[in-house]
Amino acid sequence: MNGSQTLVVKLGTSVLTGGSLRLNRAHIVELVRQCAQQHAAGHRIVIVTSGAIAAGREHLGYPELPATIASKQLLAAVGQSRLIQLWEQLFSIYGIHVGQMLLTRADLEDRERFLNARDTMTALLDNRIVPVINENDAVATAEIKVGDNDNLSALAAILAGADKLLLLTDQQGLYTADPRNNPQAELIREVHGIDDALRAIAGDSVSGLGTGGMGTKLQAADVACRAGIDVVIAAGSKPGVVADVIEGKPVGTRFHALETPLENRKRWIFGAPPAGEITVDDGAVEAMMARGSSLLPKGIREVKGDFSRGEVIRIRNLTGRDLAHGVSRYNSDAMRMIAGHHSQEISEILGYEYGPVAVHRDDMIVS
């Protein structure tokens, strides 16, 4: 349809519960109404929803459970079916079908599984079905979790080939300071590039009860904008917020997409949750950042995590700053063995080699 857009709407726990311990159904009804209205106008809508644990706790009558991962997964297992049932019931009022997609990091860090997820998303949207996405909290451990639904929504936006990503929160947008304790705080209306100054402003400011504060929203915005997707952070309570974003009206904080977005494979590299990380010395930083070189084993100081060859890893400098994401040419065990050694020693150390570089420049995205 001419002029139709694909919009990903992310609803965090603070929006879905209104700050309480239970789902705020009246608020969810209103947001579904807004989304259904845009769906009827020909736009494609994707929902990224939190709230499975809150729904499970409510359904079980707020049981007293130990604060363990197993307890959270129990609540998520009970609540996820209740949550998707709620979305299904509300969208059915408007004759709209929904399709559930539960994802973990493993689905997104592997290129083939990423493409399969993208194909599923495309099929749902092509058939006018609203994908409802959540992290698979019932089975996800710390090692396989994306970690928060802000970053999950950025990945969903890439999967959907979205035009815009709307991050709904309990704040009006990103402020120059925390508006709850600083009366001088001003709303930042437009952002044309995310830099260290903006990251410092976001800091550890929180946006309610969920796992994602403004810092994670900024991370999500960075990923989506690099993929050519506009991002808006706005209050879920603002009347007509979904239509405002579709129509391009001023609302919340708008992050403008890069004019020259990353090509598809590099969107995956930058967006995929890193399976591990490596720390590199100053010489490697100079070679990568100033000369555009590949990362050689000689420059690696430390390897963290367990990852396979072909998985995306994070590259940091000695002070811990995030420099780049890249596809590892070697698994983590091999990387530890060849770290600090010259490339010509790889075959002797491992008994095999996949080339002289640890991460090739073509498989790397500088942060």
From Swiss-Prot:
Enzyme Commission no: 2.7.2.11
Positions bound to ATP: K10, T169, D170, T211, G212, G213, M214, G215, T216, K217
Catalytic activity: L-glutamate + ATP = L-glutamyl 5-phosphate + ADP
Signal peptide span: none
Phenotype upon changing A117V: In proline hyperproducing mutant; 700-X less sensitive to proline inhibition
Domain PUA: 275-353
Xref: Pfam families: AA_kinase, PUA
Record-linked NCBIfam families: proB
Protein name: Glutamate 5-kinase
